[in-house]
Structures are given as C-alpha cells and as structure tokens.
Swiss-Prot record:
Phenotype upon changing Q20Y: No gain of activity on Kv channels
Presence of the UniProt keyword Secreted in the record: yes
Protein name: ShK homolog Ask132958
Family indicated by similarity: Belongs to the sea anemone type 1 potassium channel toxin family. Type 1a subfamily.
Keyword Cell cycle in record: no
GO cellular component term of the entry, any: nematocyst
Subcellular location: Secreted; Nematocyst
Organism: Anemonia sulcata (Mediterranean snakelocks sea anemone)
Domain ShKT: 1-29
Length: 29
C-alpha cells in the first residue's frame, strides 16, 4: 500500500493498512 494523498504520512498509511488489511483509510492504496 502507498499513500497517495498529500499531507498524509506514508508511514502512518502503511501502519494503518497493515492493521486493516489494506482498506482505503489513507487515500488510494
């Protein structure tokens, strides 16, 4: 998963997606 929304930390996106099975919680992943 990769964060695609400016202003959203990519590291936070990756951690969130690991926990939620790569659901779209931080933009298009």
């Amino acid at each position: 998963c990769e964060n695609t929304i400016s202003g959203c930390s990519r590291a936070d996106c990756l951690l969130t997606h690991r926990k939620q099975g790569c659901q779209k919680t931080c933009g298009l992943c």
